[in-house]
């Protein structure tokens, strides 16, 4: 997030000082994409770039209007949320038109809505945040001079929370790191909980195939949780076979026993 980016910038300055000769550029992948698009517009573009829509209400209205047009019904907030989630998933997973019908959004006409949504954005010269990454990736793939420029600009790349990174984000990172191979990714597929938002932990599992010279280092010491918590967590996560085998070891002394609490609804959780 932008807030996390600013916090990391502040931490770097606190550690190394404002006068450090080489202050790293700390950005979200959307921030990097924006920089790529701006550079393309200045050096190759024949007109102004599309505008990123920051007002979520504008995008929600487009989805709502299209839903009403296609179904003849008014969309509830939950319907709009699911449809927008589906749109973002398609773009982040780089799905093709042939895959749209397989996506479970609860709306049979989602493929047509998706096409019309993107058409509506282009007609307004708008792009959403996911388009920003699509355009950046397309630019890097089709303009070798721009790709070389940003590969030279980012000779060393560090990616945090890599398990939450989407497929298209990994593709952009791979393009930028291709020249030097100086890529350091920090992530844990066991902690990937944003699959519904198109997080792509498979990229971590395929890391050595994507980057043949890579080394994978496991950090198995846990400084946060007690042995009781880690015992349960290790036993639970081993049931997932699509992961790197690892056992997290505690550094803290024993704590209280772990209790399983059942709550019938959200209100019942408040007591805990």
Task: Locate each region found by the language model.
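Phosphate/oxyanion-binding loops and surfaces in catalytic or ligand/nucleic-acid-binding neighborhoods
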Residues: 15, 39, 43, 69-70, ...
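P-loop NTPase Walker
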Residues: 1-46, 148, 202, 231-234
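ATP-hydrolysis module of ASCE/P-loop NTPase motor domains
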Residues: 20-24, 42-130, 216-218, 222
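Proline-centered turn/helix-capping motifs that create local helix->coil transitions or kinks
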Residues: 75, 95, 180-181, 236-246
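Conserved nucleotide-binding/hydrolysis micro-motifs of P-loop NTPases
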Residues: 2-5, 30-33, 189-193, 198-202, ...
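Conserved helicase NTPase motor core
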Residues: 25, 54-59, 104-206, 218-225
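Residue-level signature of catalytic and energy-coupling elements of molecular machines
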Residues: 1, 28, 63, 87, ...
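Helicase P-loop NTPase motor core
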Residues: 212-215, 220-272
